Regions:
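Active-site-proximal loop/helix segment associated with metal-binding centers of metalloenzymes
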Residues: 105-172, 177-195
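A structural motif corresponding to the C-terminal end of an alpha-helix
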Residues: 83-87, 159-170, 206-213
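Active-site neighborhood of phospho(di)ester-bond hydrolases with catalytic His/Asp-centered motifs
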Residues: 1-2, 29-34, 57-62, 88-93, ...
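Conserved beta-sheet core of the metallophosphoesterase superfamily
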Residues: 49-50, 55-58, 101, 179-213
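Glycine/small-residue-rich loop that forms an oxyanion/phosphate-binding "nest" at active or ligand-binding sites
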Residues: 69-91
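N-terminal active-site segment of His-dependent metallophosphoesterases
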Residues: 1-58, 65-73, 133-143
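Active-site environment of divalent metal-dependent phosphoester hydrolases
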Residues: 6-9, 36-42, 63-74, 94-98, ...
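Short amphipathic alpha-helices and their capping/turn segments at secondary-structure boundaries
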Residues: 18-21, 46, 89, 95-101, ...
Length: 213
């Protein structure tokens, strides 16, 4: 499941969502980010943990940081998951062994501005208005921040993927941001050069390819 944006729902509708998830009778549930926003991400994760039968493994998406800063949100989520039996926030878990042959790894990643044409198009996303780290940045500073966040995700995933392939024949990667532009689609086609800088992470794609070769 990805991008449920459960902060838009009333509790009874979140309960209905959880019932639908339980009806699948899955062995595990993977949440691919954009679960809520910063002010209620922990509350909603707690609701999901209470209501969903299967173990939950998740990453964060950009919307999960809305209304706060990246480091603060990550710290609060890490604190919550340390204190809970479940769910599992994958960037703090390393390699999760689902079966003897299958490993799970994950990181929300971040669009790094390297695909498409960042310089040509002055696109202002809500991310840059609603996440503290971006609010006061000009365009060059914003690109540098996107590069840094993408590089951080790539470094983590390169290391954890190397660990995973040493012990497992199959590796499942959960991420929020597409690591290849061919996987970044909008309205039935690959996103345009205007949008690609803000919706895909080249650094992560390069890291994955370098390990798997």
């Amino acid at each position: 499941v990805t991008d449920p944006h459960l902060d838009h729902l009333q509790p009874l509708h979140i309960d209905a969502f959880c019932r639908d998830v339980n009806a699948v009778e899955a062995d595990v549930v993977l949440l691919g980010g954009d679960i809520a926003v910063a002010r209620n991400i922990r509350e909603i994760l707690r609701m999901l943990d209470d209501a969903i039968a299967a173990p939950i493994h998740f990453v964060l998406g950009n919307h999960d940081y809305y209304g706060a800063g990246i480091d603060r949100t990550r710290a609060r989520v890490a604190e919550f998951t340390r204190a809970s039996r479940r769910p599992t926030w994958l960037p703090t878990a390393g390699v999760v062994q689902l079966t003897p042959d299958t490993a799970l790894i994950g990181h929300g990643s971040w669009a790094d501005g390297r695909f498409g044409d960042y310089e040509r198009y002055d696109l202002m996303l809500n991310d840059y208005r609603l996440i503290d780290d971006f609010i006061r940045l000009d365009r060059p500073e914003r690109l540098a921040k996107l590069n840094a966040l993408g590089d951080e995700a790539a470094a983590y995933l390169r290391d954890v993927l190397e660990d995973a392939v040493r012990v497992s024949r199959r590796v499942i990667l959960l991420t929020h941001v597409p690591p290849f532009m061919e996987a970044c689609w909008h309205e039935g086609r690959i996103s345009t050069p205007e949008f690609l800088p803000h919706f895909a992470c080249k650094a992560v794609g390069d890291a994955l390819v370098s390990v798997m070769r």
